[in-house]
Design a protein with these regions (language model features):
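Amphipathic alpha-helical assembly/interaction segments
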Residues: 1-121
Length: 121
């Protein structure tokens, strides 16, 4: 299965589009620092997905890429939390982001756990 066909990729793509739309509405003092960091981090997550999916035969490397994904993903969730606390996004948008991030977390953790189990054998 190609990376772009993965359900987690579809959710990440949806999250990325939503974040780009929201960042575009940020006040100037947030758009070019916090907003840029959010976009850079969310785009970097795609790189980790592509890298992990490419390592079909090497479960150790796949696990490493998924760990890197989770590290950057944790950063993204903190950045999203800051936008919420600074009231840069609405409660509705915060709820939608929470649903997407939860879905993505479950999928990535499931993928990582599967890779870890194969690694342990």
């Amino acid at each position: 299965m190609t990376t772009t066909q993965l359900p987690v990729f579809v959710k990440m793509y949806e999250l990325n589009l939503m974040l780009m739309r929201l960042v575009n509405k940020f006040p100037k003092q947030y758009k070019y620092n916090l907003g840029n960091e959010i976009i850079k981090t969310s785009l970097r997550l795609f790189k980790h997905l592509f890298s992990a999916n490419r390592e079909r035969d090497n479960k150790v490397k796949r696990g490493q890429h998924l760990e890197e994904f989770l590290d950057d993903y944790d950063l993204l969730k903190v950045l999203i939390r800051i936008t919420n606390e600074e009231r840069l996004i609405s409660i509705k948008d915060t709820a939608n982001l929470a649903l997407l991030t939860e879905s993505i977390s479950k999928q990535i953790n499931g993928w990582k756990n599967k890779s870890d189990k194969v690694e342990d054998k």
